[in-house]
Amino acid sequence: MTLRLQRRRFRFALLRPLRTAAGELRERCGWLLRLDDDQGGVGWGEVAPLQLQQFMACEQALAALPDELPQAQLEAVLREAPGPVGFGLGAALAELQGVVGAGAPQGWLKAPAPALLLPAGEAMLAALEVAAASMGGLESCTFKWKVATAPDGLERQLLEQLLQRLPPTARLRLDANGGWDRSTAEAWMQRLRDDPRLDWLEQPLAVEDQAGLDQLAALGPVALDESLDQQPELRSSWSGWQVRRPALEGDPRLLLRELQAGLPQRMLSTAFETGIGRRWLEHLAGLQAQGPTPAAPGLAPGWTPAGPMFSNDPEQVWAAAA
C-alpha cells in the first residue's frame, strides 16, 4: 500500500515559562504529520523534540522521507528514527490501521484527573493557594513540584511549608530533572520516605549515575524519566515507577501494547503537545487508569494555551498550523 505523507510546521508559547534543573522551557515547536492511504483513510502524527540537537536530527529524518512511500518502508524508517519522529509516524500509522481512534473498538479514551504541576521555587506557594481556591481545597489531589532549581536550603524550607499545607489525602511528586547529587537526593529521601503522601522522587540523579539511582531506590520510591529516554533498555529492566512521555520515546504502539497487557507502574506525562499528540497522551493515560497501578497522569493543566491548535479534532489543529 502506498502512503502519502504531508508535514506542516507548528509553534506555540507556553502560558508561562517552565523552569527546571535542565533549564527553562518557553515554547514548543515541531511538525504535524498527515498520512493518507489510497482507500481514503487518514492518520495524524506530531513530531516535537525538546532538545535542540534532537530537533536537527528530526528535521533531517523528516526531510529524507519522500512524499509518497510504501507502508513497509515507513515501518522500517520509524524503527530507526529519532524518538519524536518514531512517535509521529507510528501514531499516524496506528490511526490509519484502526489500532486507535474512530476505527478502534474503544475509540479515543479520556484521561483521569491529572496531577497539578507546581512551578519551581517560591512561586510554588502562590500556585498552591490558587489551586486550593479554585478547587475548594486540596484533598485527594496529586501535585508535582519542580525542584533542584534554587539553593537547596531554600527548597528545603519551601518543602516544609508545602507539607504543612497538603492534607493527608494529597499526593506529592518531586521532580529534580537529574539536578541533585547523591547526598542531596538521599537527604530529601530520608525526609520524605515515611510520609504517606509521597508518590516518588522523579529522576533525582543524573542519567549517568544509574548506580546512585539504584541505591536511592533501595531507600524509597524513585521514578525514572530522562533515564528512560536516553537508555531505552531501562524500560524493560527498571522495577520502579516509569514516567513515560510517549511523544518523545518512539513508536507509541509499543507503549500501547504494554498498557493493554497490564504492565504496572507506568505513569503518562506530557511533553506539551498539540491536540494531535494530546489525543494519544490522554488515550494511553486512560488505559493506564484501567490497569493494576492507576496513577494521576502528568498532563500539566494550565500551562498550554487554548484554541484550535489544541482541539481534539486533528483537522482543526492542522488548519491552525497553516
Which positions does each model-derived feature cover?
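N-terminal capping/lid subdomain adjacent to the active-site entrance of alpha/beta enzymes
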Residues: M1-L172, N177-G179, S183, Q190-D195, ...
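Structural preference for beta-strand elements that scaffold enzyme active sites
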Residues: L32, G86, A111-A115, S140-K144, ...
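Active-site-proximal loop/turn and secondary-structure-junction residues that shape catalytic pockets
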Residues: P49, L118-A120, V147-P151, G178-W180, ...
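Short flexible/disordered coil segments
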Residues: A63-A72, A170, G178-S183, P204-Q210, ...
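Active-site-adjacent beta->alpha loops and helix N-cap segments on the catalytic face
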Residues: L125-A126, T149-L163, W180-T184, L205-A217, ...
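Short, aromatic/basic amphipathic alpha-helical patches
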Residues: A131, L162, A187-W188, Q215-L216, ...
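Aromatic-anchored, glycine/proline-accented short structural segments
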Residues: A170-P232
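Shared catalytic-loop signature of beta/alpha-barrel
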Residues: E208-D209, Q215-P221, E226-A322
